[in-house]
């Protein structure tokens, strides 16, 4: 049951990003940056002073795609998780924005670790982290890179995180619209939940030597 709930959450997330990003994104669209420093309360309750974002690192998956959907392009992305690049190649985003394929995917590890000095040297001015990465947040703060933490372990936290990243980008209205798209996608998928639970499940035997 828990697996099905998580699968539904992420299926709805993927669907919302695909539809919302596709209808609101163009390669030539110019991002609108916040006019001044804003105070953001992230998912952990931390209050973060966030200057206008120009080049950001996005550690969690699939949040580089969320930033793309909110901003309309990849212009303010600077460093992404390697998994985000793997998801980009051969999929719809590759056809929509060639700049995404040029982003750095080495300064963030597969295990979500960060190379703080490399990020600073690359001109990264802000970062999105998972909610448990307090040590990484402190490390980046010490070198002048503010961070916000997000979480998508539940529908409520996911939608709050949309708004947090939207505020970070100065795209609060877009974040609210993305939440509406997500609600629609989630409702569409959960409408078939009973059918999925009743369906015959394959039995798989794992052998280990």
Over which residues does each language-model region extend?
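Short beta-strand->loop
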Residues: 79-82, 128-131, 149-153, 172, ...
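Bacterial Sec-exported substrate-binding components of ABC uptake systems
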Residues: 6-9, 22-66, 173-207
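Solvent-exposed loop/turn segments at secondary-structure junctions
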Residues: 62-65, 83-86, 126-136, 153-157, ...
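Short, well-structured alpha-helical segments in soluble
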Residues: 43-47, 113-121
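A short, structured surface patch at a secondary-structure boundary
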Residues: 64-118, 126
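Loop/turn elements at helix/coil->beta-strand transitions in domains of secreted/extracellular proteins
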Residues: 54, 74-77, 123-126, 143-146, ...
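Charged, glycine-enriched surface loops/patches
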Residues: 136-173
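Bacterial Sec-type N-terminal signal peptides, specifically the leucine/valine-rich hydrophobic h-region
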Residues: 17-20
């Amino acid at each position: 049951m828990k697996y099905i709930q998580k699968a539904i959450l992420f299926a709805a997330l993927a669907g919302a990003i695909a539809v919302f990003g596709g209808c609101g994104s163009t390669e030539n669209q110019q991002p609108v940056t916040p006019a001044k420093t804003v105070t953001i309360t992230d998912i952990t309750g931390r209050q973060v002073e966030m200057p206008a974002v120009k080049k950001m690192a996005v550690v969690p998956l699939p949040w580089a795609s969320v930033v793309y959907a909110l901003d309309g392009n990849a212009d303010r992305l600077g460093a992404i998780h390697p998994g985000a690049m793997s998801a980009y190649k051969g999929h719809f985003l590759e056809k929509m924005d060639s700049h995404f394929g040029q982003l750095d995917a080495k300064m963030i590890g597969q295990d979500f670790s960060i190379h703080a000095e490399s990020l600073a040297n690359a001109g990264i001015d802000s970062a999105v982290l998972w909610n448990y990465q307090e040590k990484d947040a402190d490390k980046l703060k010490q070198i002048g890179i503010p961070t916000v933490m997000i979480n998508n372990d539940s529908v409520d936290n996911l939608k709050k995180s949309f708004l947090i990243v939207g505020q970070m980008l100065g795209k609060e209205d877009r974040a609210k619209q993305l939440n509406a798209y997500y609600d629609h996608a989630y409702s569409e998928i959960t409408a078939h939940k009973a059918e999925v639970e009743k369906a015959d499940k394959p039995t798989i035997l794992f052998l280990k030597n």
